[in-house]
Amino acid sequence: MVDNCCRCKNAEYNYGTAWKKERTADLVVEAIRAGFRGIDTACQPKHYNEALVGVALHRLKDYGIERKELFLQTKFTPLLGQDPGQVPYDKSAPLELQIAQSFEASKINLQAEYVDSLILHSPIAPHSQMMRAWGAMEKIHKTGGARQLGISNCYNAKLIKELYAA
């Protein structure tokens, strides 16, 4: 584990769980036993199976590897990134509630009380929506649900600075 700017412990390498489908649990266990200490997933059934990551976390106890030894990262995926038939939150709910519902689904799927990192899977337009999303994520962080926040698939340095300053 390595320190970062918020004094959280990050894994040196994360194992990505996208596109593993029914093999997710076995592959996560194999990766962690091989030395990975970070797991990256998302509440996005289109590409991830978070419930099988949760199964893997449970199975790892049989090898003496506890949750607290791992860096667990999940993501909120906005509607545009979801399969319309498998959205893990209420599509018609306000954005803030979608994020809260997605995060609660992640905790249930992962059988975890908290995650080390909650990531916004991609920027959201318009900017006002993006800032609302970030505010909802900050609430999760402030209540201890996520130890740190981030954004992926963002190529706008100005936006990253704005989120950091928020």
Residue ranges with predicted function:
Residues 70-85:
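Eukaryotic helix-linker segments that join adjacent hydrophobic helices
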Residues 18-20, 44, 75-79, 120-123, ...:
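Active-site beta-loop-alpha junctions enriched in small/polar residues
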Residues 83-166:
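Glycine/proline-rich, positively charged
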Residues 66, 77, 93-94:
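Alpha-helix initiation/capping motif
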Residues 1-74, 113, 132, 142:
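N-terminal binding-site loop/beta-alpha segment at the start of enzyme catalytic domains
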